Amino acid sequence: MRGSNLFQLTLALLLSLVAAEDGYNGWLRYAPVSCDLHCRQALPSHIVLLNSTKGSPIETAGRELKAGFQSILSTNLTFHPFQCDSSASILVATLDEYRQKCRDINLPELDPDGFWLQSEGDTVRILGNNARGALYGAYEYLAMVAQRNFSRVAYTTNPHAPIRWVNQWDNMDGSIERGYGGASIFFKDGTVVEDMAPVEQYARLLASIRINAIVVNNVNANATLLLPENMKGLGRIADACRPYGVQIGISLNFASPESLGGLETYDPLDPGVIAWWQNITDSLYTYVPDMAGYLVKADSEGQPGPDTYNRTLSQGANLFARALQPHGGVLMYRAFVYNDNLNESDWKADRAKAAVEYFKDLDGQFYENVVVQIKYGPIDFQVREPTSPLFANLYQTNTAIELEVSQEYLGQQCHLVYLPPLWKTVLDFDLRVDHKPSMVRDILSGQRFNRTLGGWAAVVNVGTNRTWLGSHLAMSNLYAYGRLAWSPTDDSEQILKDWTRLTFGQNRQVIDTIADMPMTSWPAYENYTGNLGIQTLTDILYTHYGPNPATQDNNGWGQWTRADHNSVGMDRTISNGTGYTGQYPEEVARLYESLETTPDDLVLWFHHVPWTHRLHSGLTVIQHFYNAHYAGSEAAHGFIRQWESLKGLIDRERYEAMRSRLVYQAGHSIVWRDAINNFYYNMTGIPDVAGRVGHHPWRIEAESMRLDGYQTYTVSPFEAASNTTAIITTSNSTTGTARTTIKAPSGVYDIGVNYYDLYGGQSKWTLSVGDKVVGQWLGDMEHQSLGHTPSIYLDGHSATRITFHGVVVRQGDQLKIVGEANGVEPAPVDYVVLLPPGVVD
């Protein structure tokens, strides 16, 4: 589909906004803005394209400009033949073509993908270093117009780094590992899908934020992607992305020569293996002549790699880099290599040290088209980690940072968490290599160590959900990733406001409210999950979603907290611990080696301290835990009130979808708060000085009610239930009733019911007070759009809350819950809470 057909598709997508706002267009809604007569007199009336061959990004730029002006301003721009100095026009060209066809123009230097934008009233010129840069300039101009910014501008902008990629962890069967927004848009049933429309729309969104490549499949790769029919399918994906200047790459399974090719080895130094990969690579480039390259995960979490044959990681990486070199491809090699069977009884054992231990001595041994892809922290996308020291240990090797837009450990898009402030703690961190300024962002750009290749990768994992990520507000993270990959000094809040204007419109209250909520969301989530550098206290052995702090310890995965009755934290000092601090340059090592100079927010990452240790804040560690978890949950409840203030200012579909998600988050934040506080109170025996932990005067424990057809059930882990116990029906096909007499004073209450919504069943509950039914609900979250990894157990993942507001209660009324079991779900209930107005518990 090309030319006018593509324009009609783009315009149809935009006009569909009149009927519905489902999020499919993201920040490219091109919603109408006001433009009076004076404003319209200063608008261009036609588009002039230079060398707009079919399917080129410049042709795409023209199509986007035409559709955008039609949608935003109801203005029909016409295409005119090329003229060098056409007035009342938008001219789009590459700089070289413009200079050849028109005249030389004195501009600041343009790097690959960079562009120059000049807007002077009705005349706009967009010149790119290449066609992709010209398209980026068109999107930049449209973003200005969509925000009702018609100012005169003239500036050049260049990318921070050449690599600005996204990674998809899509599997060949159509599932997505750590994906929370539906099934794959690329694969189904072992092959590439036929419908490329979502792929094209995804490429369009990526191009608008200046992302230049997608790795389309999971790093835990399936070798069948390399079958001829799937190579042909990759060609179709590339064809859909190419008009937007987005290249594709693929992840490889290191053992493919053996598992797919029938060889007896996958030794990277074996001539037969080398020849096999060269043949595969050459074949891929016949289908995808502009393929960006490969991504490889090796010797990690069960994935095969060069270590099988006692070969180095650089020898493994160079195997693929050599095959890519004739085609100009790049090999991204993940630094996520570690031993997942560590011995916790060894005080010196430390997973955080793995990346430097594996890669530092190989510095300078990687081919020039190899980029080592390094997670922002040394463990795994935690709510807070120190900057990976590997960035300071590779001087002669290209590097890229790996971020995660998909909220694997951070609420899985069911919790609002705006990630740029977290990313900024790493990007802006000064590693002080050789006692010189060494910002991580300057290492990524190549500026610090004089490298020409490097940059950015983010695990995104969009899916078939119309919101792409499962949540409207989560798309702010994808938008911000593109903005920061282009210009990492941009302000997180300003990026958010730009995204809000493009996504939700120009209303000042909407902009201010949505800017405030996400900007406080990461601190809130950190508060009610894991504090002081202890990591996200989620279940690392199961879903990576709900609370289960015990899973951090007593296994070989190395995400230990070393918490016991007396003390907590990892001692990573040189003097008495694992020696991890010594992997940093001297100034940073000295900062973290001392308990006195280590910031509170990382104290448990670097030091093992008593629970009664006083922080710089003056609080003890345990009291900080208690306070933070209460504060975080309070903040999550505040998000609901803030969002509800926007009712009528946002279209109903997106308003209701986001409100239900925020209500869920608030309820789950209570689950998190109580689970973590109860776990550590039980461990330490140290009470909360404010008397909150374990004290819930508004609650009625389900097991204390009169039960008929229900029985008590001891929940595991214990902290996933308010009083360690819940109730379940006596069988999975019966009905249970729980009754109690209300002792609270008569009045108006919000009544919350904490229950468990298990995967594989749809129980039905009915809540009554007196002779009135307050509400009914189903345990059907797996059929809603929440998307988080489900659980078949009563635990911190399945625990949730439903709240009925403004219920009139009389003292002495009977409160009754009737639960009808279904499937594997025995209508489980934890407790009921009667909350006076303004109380959170």
Swiss-Prot record:
SUPFAM superfamilies per record: (Trans)glycosidases (SSF51445), beta-N-acetylhexosaminidase-like domain (SSF55545)
EC number annotated for this UniProt entry: 3.2.1.139
Temperature dependence comment: Optimum temperature is 70 degrees Celsius.
Residues annotated as signal peptide: 1-20
Record GO biological process: xylan catabolic process
Transmembrane regions listed in the UniProt entry: none
Cellular location(s): Secreted
Pfam families per UniProt: Glyco_hydro_67C, Glyco_hydro_67M, Glyco_hydro_67N
Top EC class, one word: hydrolase
GO terms under cellular component: extracellular region
Chief location category: secreted
Glycosylation site list: N51, N76, N149, N222, N279, N310, N343, N450, N465, N527, N576, N682, N723, N732
Induction profile: By xylan and xylose but not by glucuronic acid.
Alphabetical keyword list: Carbohydrate metabolism, Glycoprotein, Glycosidase, Hydrolase, Polysaccharide degradation, Secreted, Signal, Xylan degradation
Single GO term (MF): alpha-glucuronidase activity
Catalytic activity, as annotated: an alpha-D-glucuronoside + H2O = D-glucuronate + an alcohol
pH dependence: Optimum pH is 4.5-6.0.
Family in the record: Belongs to the glycosyl hydrolase 67 family.
Function: Alpha-glucuronidase involved in the hydrolysis of xylan, a major structural heterogeneous polysaccharide found in plant biomass representing the second most abundant polysaccharide in the biosphere, after cellulose. Releases 4-O-methylglucuronic acid from xylan.
PANTHER family reported in the protein's UniProt record: ALPHA-GLUCURONIDASE A
Protein name: Alpha-glucuronidase A
Organism this protein belongs to: Aspergillus tubingensis
